[in-house]
Amino acid sequence: MPLNYQSGFGNACATEALPGALPQGRNSPQQCPYGLYAEQLSGTAFTAPRSENRRSWLYRIRPGVVHRPFEPYAGAPHWLADFGTGPVTPNQLRWSPLPLPATPTDFIDGVHTWGGNGGPDEQSGVGIHLYAANQSMKGRFFYNADAEMLLVPQLGRLRLATEMGLLDLEPLEIAVLPRGVRFRVELLDAEARGYLLENFGTALRPPELGPIGSNGLANARDFQTPVAWYEDVEGDFELIAKFTGGFWRAPLTHSPLDVVAWHGTHAPYKYDLRHFNTIGSISYDHPDPSIFTVLTSPSDTPGTANLDFAIFPPRILAMENTFRPPWFHRNIASEFMGLIQGVYDAKAEGFAPGGASLHNCMSGHGPDADTFEKASVADTSKAHYIRDTMAFMFETRRVIRPTRQALASAQLQGDYYQCWQDLKKHFNPEKA
């Protein structure tokens, strides 16, 4: 049965699973309805501007402080916080898809860190990961104190059971889990694989539209936030926390997903990438890829993001006398790309769904030789329909440091550079 959601981005939501569970006219009454506890979850400073402020009030069966002391957790062996301090290769890197696990593995233990920059101490930068799992989280829950988490499924459906309600997620949808929200990941199919980004910086939001106007790109109405849902379950559970890069576990005697009602702005949400209103040129030239931005995390430098999440969706190319694929590029920003389905229009082969590529600051990249030759002679008087595709990009202002396990991975394509070596010399000084 399909879940119900609240619609809109950044709304001050209010929802209750039992009638009258939300206090009226105040946040913390002397006694809450149904004998619940009031607890505030703050995602920004108390004094953050109203437009930036993220906080929610939760009305729950037990407050979040009810747990035994945390101890170090030895699991999540491939989820790393150390991106290294040594030299970073300027080479273009590409990986084949992460294999699905051969032994029982849930989401937390199935995360593999591929790179990142910054960290939670400075509240800036990103962690970039792949995940592969074949079982649901059983008897345990997780929260991330370090970062907001962006999930991009490539294979298999997920149910995110969170303190604030349920989110069902499938490939071509994304979800964002704010800092501190407790949850478990359930697999709705036998196997799951995808991408995970930790945003250590300012919370994600849709980009400003500027001269595009009041509509376009990811429209606010298409973001969906869960309605209140709870479980009142006692037993032996564990709560896993990610805190300053380390993993910790605390025993619980109850499920922490016991929020009966809540209101506020700090909440998980999902978005269907198929609703993205793609903007493009209807005259000439391929515009900058910033027009494909779904979500952005601003930095302290205006116009320069801590992170941009952009997609390259199905679209119609109508530009005339134009090289239509993405052009050759060297960028001050660093670009990590993934592919959810289909084929990326700048790479004829080698970039498979579930795979990834990394083009760091000023490392040249662009269409492969086959794509260039075909696009250079294509008939641009006719529109070209790109249908079977959904690529995405995590673009950051800082160099992305690939982890040792990513560089040592069997999925690293050592011959990636070869896709450009057949680009021919066409220069003829006698012919303009």
From Swiss-Prot:
Q: Which GO terms describe its molecular function?
A: homogentisate 1,2-dioxygenase activity; iron ion binding
Q: Name the positions where homogentisate binds.
A: Y344, H365
Oxidoreductase keyword on record: yes
User: Which positions are annotated as binding Fe cation?
Assistant: H329, E335, H365
Q: Catalysed reaction per UniProt?
A: homogentisate + O2 = 4-maleylacetoacetate + H(+)
Question: What InterPro entries does the entry give?
Answer: HgmA_C, HgmA_N, Homogentis_dOase, Homogentis_dOase_bac, RmlC-like_jellyroll, RmlC_Cupin_sf
Q: Which UniProt keywords apply?
A: Dioxygenase, Iron, Metal-binding, Oxidoreductase, Phenylalanine catabolism, Tyrosine catabolism
Matches recorded under NCBIfam families: hmgA (TIGR01015)
Q: Which family does it belong to?
A: Belongs to the homogentisate dioxygenase family.
**Role played:** Involved in the catabolism of homogentisate (2,5-dihydroxyphenylacetate or 2,5-OH-PhAc), a central intermediate in the degradation of phenylalanine and tyrosine. Catalyzes the oxidative ring cleavage of the aromatic ring of homogentisate to yield maleylacetoacetate.
Q: What is this protein called?
A: Homogentisate 1,2-dioxygenase
* Gene that this sequence comes from: hmgA
